[in-house]
């Protein structure tokens, strides 16, 4: 294991601790009695007193944070008092795979579309293809996701499902929590196709801004690489235009794109809240929104903490991938 990977792994606990501290402070910053916020203002006094004792709200703040960290280390994110005291971790375990599934689908669309537009813009710089591609990219950044979602529903609602993860008549085996994977493993082709049709529209809507960002970064990186000496050498040696672009240029232009992936994943996790609301997607976005409406502060805190840790974990993977793509980083070169 290289020193670079070791350094990244050493900082991971510090980052996760900082995330937990921020979530704790935000939860304690809620005005009023936290026990009443959890159990509800109309809850009996005995219930609120019991919550104060169980959750340590009657103790000093440093002690409360110590108890909070102790529960986190045991995997205890709290309970949903308005849903029969069900564990928040159990609820999140049902919702998180759906959001990750939507996020990965949107990232696949953004990466494929962004690379295509960026490469075409760089190869045909100054032409109509370049102008059209960058216009699409600019529109993708400018249009609000919720408004675009409503337009998609109006335009394609007669052809594609506009709500939910799967048709109510299908019941796939719950093996992984990911609807696409579970329907595929079931061997029912019609059910899998229905799952694909359900994820298609929200994934397209959610991917618009990351697609535009990928296209612009790819174009800028490709233009820089295409003007380098080794590209001119490859062309002079008779390499085909497609090989020059896809093998020589794209490989060396990939570093900024890989760096962008981690940031895009974070945006997609945040953007999923709006997208899931528009398309009634049963994921973390709708879970957080319903928790806000029901003043389930422990559910909100648990969801935010899990999403933040997911984002940190994905960025760690991207950093490690970056180190394998660029050996200078892996070996600690000062030129990196």
Model-derived features: where do they sit?
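Alpha-helical transmembrane segments of integral membrane proteins
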Residues: 2-3, 96-129, 145, 173-336
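Hydrophobic alpha-helical segments of integral membrane proteins
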Residues: 9, 51, 61-77, 88, ...
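Hydrophobic alpha-helical transmembrane segments of membrane transport/permease proteins
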Residues: 15-66, 156-191
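An internal, D/E-rich "acidic patch" concept
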Residues: 58-115
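Pore- or pathway-lining transmembrane helices of multi-pass membrane proteins that form conduits
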Residues: 130-154
């Amino acid at each position: 294991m290289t020193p670079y990977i070791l350094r990244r792994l050493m900082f991971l606990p510090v980052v996760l601790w900082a995330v937990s501290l921020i979530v704790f402070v935000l939860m304690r910053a809620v005005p009023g009695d936290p026990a009443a916020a959890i159990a509800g203002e109309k809850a009996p006094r005995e219930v609120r007193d019991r919550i104060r004792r169980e959750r340590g709200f009657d103790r000093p703040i440093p002690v409360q944070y110590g108890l909070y960290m102790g529960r986190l280390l045991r995997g205890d994110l709290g309970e949903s008092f308005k849903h029969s005291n069900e564990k928040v971790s159990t609820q999140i375990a049902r919702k998180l795979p759906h959001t990750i599934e939507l996020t990965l689908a949107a990232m696949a669309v953004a990466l494929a579309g962004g690379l295509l537009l960026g490469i075409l813009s760089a190869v045909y710089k100054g032409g109509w293809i370049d102008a059209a591609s960058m216009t699409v990219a600019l529109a993708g950044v400018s249009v609000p996701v919720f408004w675009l979602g409503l337009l998609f529903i109006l335009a394609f609602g007669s052809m594609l499902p506009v709500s939910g993860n799967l048709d109510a008549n299908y019941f796939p085996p719950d093996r992984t929590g990911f609807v696409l994977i579970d329907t595929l493993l079931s061997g029912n082709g019609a059910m899998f196709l229905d799952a694909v049709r359900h994820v298609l529209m929200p994934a397209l809507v959610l991917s618009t801004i990351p697609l535009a960002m990928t296209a612009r970064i790819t174009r800028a990186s490709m233009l820089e690489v295409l003007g380098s000496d080794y590209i001119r050498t490859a062309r002079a040696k008779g390499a085909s235009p497609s090989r020059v672009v896809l093998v020589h240029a794209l490989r060396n232009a990939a570093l900024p794109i890989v760096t962008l992936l981690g940031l895009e994943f974070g945006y997609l996790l945040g953007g999923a809240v709006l997208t899931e609301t528009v398309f009634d997607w049963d994921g973390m976005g709708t879970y957080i929104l319903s928790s806000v409406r029901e003043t389930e502060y422990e559910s909100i805190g648990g969801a935010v903490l899990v999403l933040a840790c997911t984002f940190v974990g994905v960025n760690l993977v991207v950093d490690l991938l970056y180190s394998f793509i660029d050996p200078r980083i892996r070996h600690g070169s000062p030129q990196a």
